[in-house]
Swiss-Prot record:
<feature type="zinc finger region" description="C4-type">
    <location>
        <begin position="56"/>
        <end position="71"/>
    </location>
</feature>
<keyword id="KW-0863">Zinc-finger</keyword>
<keyword id="KW-0479">Metal-binding</keyword>
<comment type="function">
    <text>May play a role in DNA repair. It seems to be involved in an RecBC-independent recombinational process of DNA repair. It may act with RecF and RecO.</text>
</comment>
<dbReference type="GO" id="GO:0008270">
    <property type="term" value="F:zinc ion binding"/>
</dbReference>
<dbReference type="InterPro" id="IPR034137">
    <property type="entry name" value="TOPRIM_RecR"/>
</dbReference>
<dbReference type="Pfam" id="PF21175">
    <property type="entry name" value="RecR_C"/>
</dbReference>
<protein>
    <recommendedName>
        <fullName>Recombination protein RecR</fullName>
    </recommendedName>
</protein>
<dbReference type="Pfam" id="PF02132">
    <property type="entry name" value="RecR_ZnF"/>
</dbReference>
<dbReference type="GO" id="GO:0003677">
    <property type="term" value="F:DNA binding"/>
</dbReference>
<dbReference type="GO" id="GO:0006310">
    <property type="term" value="P:DNA recombination"/>
</dbReference>
<keyword id="KW-0227">DNA damage</keyword>
<dbReference type="InterPro" id="IPR000093">
    <property type="entry name" value="DNA_Rcmb_RecR"/>
</dbReference>
<dbReference type="Pfam" id="PF21176">
    <property type="entry name" value="RecR_HhH"/>
</dbReference>
<dbReference type="InterPro" id="IPR023627">
    <property type="entry name" value="Rcmb_RecR"/>
</dbReference>
<keyword id="KW-0233">DNA recombination</keyword>
<dbReference type="Pfam" id="PF13662">
    <property type="entry name" value="Toprim_4"/>
</dbReference>
């Protein structure tokens, strides 16, 4: 039998993606058994992240500095890669084949979910196209909502004076950017094509 504090902690852990009740119990037991080595450093790291990490007002990524390190890096190429989530941005950064900037939508257009263009920061993206950006790369999932979002963005950006491209094959239909291995991401990014 678990006390209320442990039960609450297990319940919160089980709500994390990829964790069920059994995994959550094992994690909580390990954290409690190794309080000094694991639990206290985790608490400190979570507290620091909660206090310092915020959404970048430019790209929508996460960082402890504002604007984020990527947006502030003048050595980045004049490209913007549009992704659905921060996890997708991190996956592309891990692949180390892209040196431009990002725009994180935070979702996709979806009539069923009630997400329209105003919910995705698309106006912020258009405002960033000030003449210094030469290409917008749409790195969106190959799902119905991803395709609809890519189509909308292609039409919306057609008059902005930038080349709009999409990732090439290698991203499976129904697949998510964040789960792809670095080799697949590198191939898809290097073989991108014009959208539309």
């Amino acid at each position: 039998m678990m006390g209320p504090e442990i039960e609450r902690l297990v319940g919160l852990m089980a709500r994390l993606p990829g964790l069920g009740p059994r995994s959550a119990r094992r994690i909580v037991l390990r954290l409690m058994a190794e309080r000094e080595q694991r639990l206290l450093p985790l608490i400190a790291a979570l507290d620091a992240a909660c206090q310092r990490v915020a959404v970048c007002p430019v790209c929508g990524g996460l960082d402890s500095q504002q604007p984020c390190m990527i947006c502030a890096d003048a050595a980045r190429e004049p490209l913007i890669c549009v992704v659905e989530t921060v996890a997708d941005q991190w996956a592309l950064e891990r692949a180390a084949v892209y040196r431009g900037r990002y725009h994180v939508l935070g979702g996709l257009l979806s009539a069923i979910a009630g997400h329209g263009p105003e919910d995705l920061g698309i106006d912020r993206l258009v405002a960033r196209l000030d003449g210094s950006v030469r290409e917008v790369i749409l790195a969106l999932p190959a799902t119905v909502d991803g395709q609809a979002t890519a189509h909308y963005l292609t039409e919306r950006l057609a008059t902005c004076g930038v080349s709009v491209t999409r990732l090439a094959q290698g991203v499976p239909v129904g697949g998510s950017i964040e789960i792809l291995d670095e080799g697949t991401l590198a191939l898809a990014l290097s073989a991108r094509r014009a959208a539309g």
